[in-house]
Structure formats: structure tokens, C-alpha cells
């Protein structure tokens, strides 16, 4: 299963994008701004391919996707939030009411605009198609990210693996052409 996040709007205060599941649009995203050579919490995570795992978040107390082996970052989750101030380095999912600095959009309130309709539904509904595909779930809320990575390395996984490709509008057409030529996602490793 492949999630693709395409970043398409960059401002000094936030990065906006669109999240796709197996190339079908799923929702909008908000992340921290792009900061060259960023280390959490200054900017968003670097472009690239990352493995995902569903696990119970100690902070939120429910099943959420966790990106792991992200250079310079730990505990990067995909979860709901209302605006860029709620990212803490994570990827917020929802439906954008306002694309900051983009003419012709509607602001839902506040200078930063916001993301709505996903306060409780967003990340939970993102988990639904993942669980339906048989991707394994870790329900160990007390595991650190390193313990989670170690556990995953030691398990033989016969289930479908979950990846996220974080890219931008300049790189995506080339990546898509490459993916179209591959027989399966395992070729990406």
C-alpha cells in the first residue's frame, strides 16, 4: 500500500499538500514550513520514502500512523489538527478551508486559516483503509520509536508493507513515471 503526500504550497509559516492512498485523493495536509537542513520542530521532514506502521499513540491514546527512520526526527505521526500550530512536526490531515496566501479560497477563521472536518475523523478514517488491507498493527503504546523499529526489524512480516512517499509538485511527475515502470513496490527499496 502506498501513501503519497504531494506538497504544493509553501509559505514561511506552513507547508500545504495533498495525501493520496494508492493514487486516489484522500485529504489535504498541513506541515511545518520547509526549512533547509531542518531538524524538528523547525521544519517539515525531508522529501523521501518512509515506512509507516500503525500503532497506538501514547499522546493521543489511539491508533495512528507513525513514520519511522526519518533522519533527524522521531515520533512523526499523521493525525488531525486544526491549524499549523498543532503540527509539532507531524503531518496534519483534513480538509482545507483556507489555503494561506492562495487567492480565491475561503478562510475558516484566524490568520493561518485552518484544516477542518477531521478533528476526530481524519486520522482514524486514514487508518480504516490501511487496516482493511491487512497491514499489521502494533498496539504497544509504551514503545519508543527505536523500540518499535527494533521490534519491526526482528519480526518476519508476511503482511503488506506500508510506505509513504513525501514529494513535491516538481518531483512527482518523474517519480510517477518511474513507479509506473516498476512491477511492484518492493522495487523501491
Model-found features: residue ranges?
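Cell wall/extracellular polymer interaction/catalysis modules
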Residues: 1-188
Amino acid at each position: 500500500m502506498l501513501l503519497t503526500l504531494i506538497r504544493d504550497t509553501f509559505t514561511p509559516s506552513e507547508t500545504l499538500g495533498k495525501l493520496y492512498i494508492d493514487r486516489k485523493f484522500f485529504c489535504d495536509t498541513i506541515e511545518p514550513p520547509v526549512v533547509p537542513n531542518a531538524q524538528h520542530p523547525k521544519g517539515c521532514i525531508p522529501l523521501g520514502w518512509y515506512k509507516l506502521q500503525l500503532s497506538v499513540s501514547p499522546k493521543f491514546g489511539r491508533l495512528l500512523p507513525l513514520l519511522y527512520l526519518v533522519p533527524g526526527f522521531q515520533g512523526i505521526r499523521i493525525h488531525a489538527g486544526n491549524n499549523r500550530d498543532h503540527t509539532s512536526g507531524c503531518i496534519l490531515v483534513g480538509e482545507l478551508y483556507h489555503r494561506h496566501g492562495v487567492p480565491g479560497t475561503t478562510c475558516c477563521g484566524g490568520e493561518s486559516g485552518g484544516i477542518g472536518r477531521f478533528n476526530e475523523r481524519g486520522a482514524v478514517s486514514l487508518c480504516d483503509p490501511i487496516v482493511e488491507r491487512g497491514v499489521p498493527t502494533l498496539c504497544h503504546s509504551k514503545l519508543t520509536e527505536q523500540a518499535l523499529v527494533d521490534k519491526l526489524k526482528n519480526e518476519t512480516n508476511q503482511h503488506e508493507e506500508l510506505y509513504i512517499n513525501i514529494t513535491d509538485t516538481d518531483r512527482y511527475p518523474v517519480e510517477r513515471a518511474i513507479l509506473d515502470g516498476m512491477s511492484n513496490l518492493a522495487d523501491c527499496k
